[in-house]
């Protein structure tokens, strides 16, 4: 049910909480799972979700971040720009469940951030951890020992009027039913699908990794997976390196402002290190991929091609070739590997032996881009 523009129902599976060793935490995590599932399936933005569910979601996020790396990690991982929204939800949830001590601590943290923006931006919870935040961490942990958020949240959640506890076999059907209540669902699903491709084409680390894989000679390597980046020493220098899975195996990709370098992953001697260098790609080449991809609407084109071919649009892409007015990507989806060549005239998806799989004219791509744009616009909060 949708009431005043928001979903009014929260569904959690019974087996997620019955028999759990820590039932209070299990209830919280079930709500987090619901938020993730319904936002993925129904493409509901925050302002269309049940308010209490979003408040719980961000209160649990706050709890997890502080427990792991203190308020400094919470600030770092949330980002200064998103801190007011995330903290606003968490504060509302903490107040509603009765976690008043933790609520006050978060209020004080926000006041400190507002007064010390430059210092706040440097916090990470570990190597950079301000004295004020250390004191807040200590108070938070003391409050948790006295009145843990999990216990308070579980009691609060149990009283929600829109809560439905169902069998596991019913859970996905209920998520699908709630998703179908979204009047903008088809356009939003196109937007959501296009966005995950666009992110791979525009986010600096992701596109650099994609281009470094595509630059391997004599044959490009197909990017299949990217793991979180870590600081490590490579060739005598501290670098930001990402674990990468390709069709040839495990790799490391160094990301720098000047570009990227792809290495074999060396696990000999019980350590993780960079092995032989496989490729290098400069920032200029990376930005050329970004520019041309935007000009020819590469994200929309690939999504359209995959759907026309009956393939899963949730794909990983490798930046292979770029030239004035055109770009070619290697697309990996499921067990399929294909090349997507896109230019001003249109796009074609081909098998490794160059057999065409699907094609799209420029007009088709532009119409599809308009559908995605409509879906994106519908996600904006009302004025």
Q: Which positions does each model-derived feature cover?
A:
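Core of folded catalytic or high-affinity ligand/protein-binding domains
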Residues: 45-141
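Long, amphipathic alpha-helical surface segments
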Residues: 118-186
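Generic hydrophobic, helix-prone segments enriched in Leu/Val/Ile
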Residues: 26-34, 149-154, 208-213, 253-255, ...
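Charge-rich, solvent-exposed alpha-helical interaction surfaces
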Residues: 30, 34, 93, 135, ...
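Membrane topogenic helices and adjacent juxtamembrane segments
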Residues: 1-52
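Surface-exposed polar/charged interaction patches
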Residues: 37, 41, 65, 69, ...
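Charge-rich interaction segments
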Residues: 171-242
